[in-house]
């Protein structure tokens, strides 16, 4: 069983990594192709392409200029500790023990606009390139066309090597669109997290993102290899709702949070 997650725009570059083990991204040669083109963009072009402020555009122009291989622990950081959004706050990998970190490395993959598909301990250098960005490139008009079948093929190889036939999709639609589900050789399960608000259950983005990270943490802490065991996920008040679920979409609900 493998999980796929989205990356995060917010990055934690400063805090030291709690583990020394690292791996290298499998698709780094592809990243270098993209980065050569990204480096050609002036800050104003980055601002327009990514719809960000001048300050963020300048930061990322500087990141692009500084980006270089080979990646080492001195100039890069393991992806699961670099990404710093809601999903990763829910996962809170910094407080997992060594065995649990190894679980992440063996069962979790992170989708990325620049790096394609990452293991949690793959070294990465800071960047900003969301998968949905309309970044025209050598292979097409956007990143979905750039990556083509590359991410799906690597996922299939990863699943086959592990003898796994289940992929749990905890990524956003923007990122999971980079996976060709018709060519994916695995059973696909998509957990959906709904919170009660004013008596109705619906997806609330912040809570849903955090819950995705919490589910990965739950799996790591319980060393889960059987997908059915994920139905016992109960962190922070969530509970599996069988009536609202089907074979491929598993719905977890939580009663309204009393502030």
Swiss-Prot record:
Domain of life where this protein originates: Bacteria
InterPro entries: YaaA
Biological process, per Gene Ontology: response to hydroperoxide
Cellular component per GO, a single term: cytosol
Family: Belongs to the UPF0246 family.
HAMAP family the UniProt entry points to: UPF0246
Protein name: UPF0246 protein NGO_0461
Organism field: Neisseria gonorrhoeae (strain ATCC 700825 / FA 1090)
């Amino acid at each position: 069983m493998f999980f796929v997650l989205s990356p995060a725009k917010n990055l934690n570059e400063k805090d030291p990594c709690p583990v020394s083990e690292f791996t290298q991204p499998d698709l780094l040669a592809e990243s270098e192709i993209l980065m050569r083109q990204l480096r050609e963009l002036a800050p104003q072009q980055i601002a327009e392409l990514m719809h960000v402020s001048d300050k963020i555009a300048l930061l990322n122009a500087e990141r692009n200029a500084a980006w270089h291989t080979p990646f080492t622990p001195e100039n890069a950081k393991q992806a699961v500790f670099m990404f710093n959004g809601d999903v990763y706050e829910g996962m809170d990998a910094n407080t997992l023990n060594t065995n649990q970190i190894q679980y992440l490395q063996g069962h979790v993959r992170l989708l990325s606009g620049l790096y394609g598909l990452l293991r949690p301990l793959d070294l990465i250098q800071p960047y900003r390139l969301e998968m949905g960005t309309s970044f025209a490139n050598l292979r097409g008009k956007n990143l979905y066309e750039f990556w083509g079948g590359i991410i799906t093929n690597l996922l299939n190889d990863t699943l086959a090597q592990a003898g796994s036939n289940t992929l749990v999709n905890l990524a956003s639609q923007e990122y999971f669109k980079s996976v060709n589900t018709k060519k994916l050789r695995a059973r696909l399960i998509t957990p959906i997290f709904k919170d009660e608000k004013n008596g109705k259950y619906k997806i609330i983005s912040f809570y849903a993102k955090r819950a995705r990270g919490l589910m990965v943490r739950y799996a790591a802490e319980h060393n889960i290899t059987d997908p059915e065991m994920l139905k016992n996920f109960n962190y922070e008040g969530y509970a599996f709702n069988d009536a609202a679920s089907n074979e491929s979409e598993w719905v977890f609900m939580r009663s309204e949070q009393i502030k």
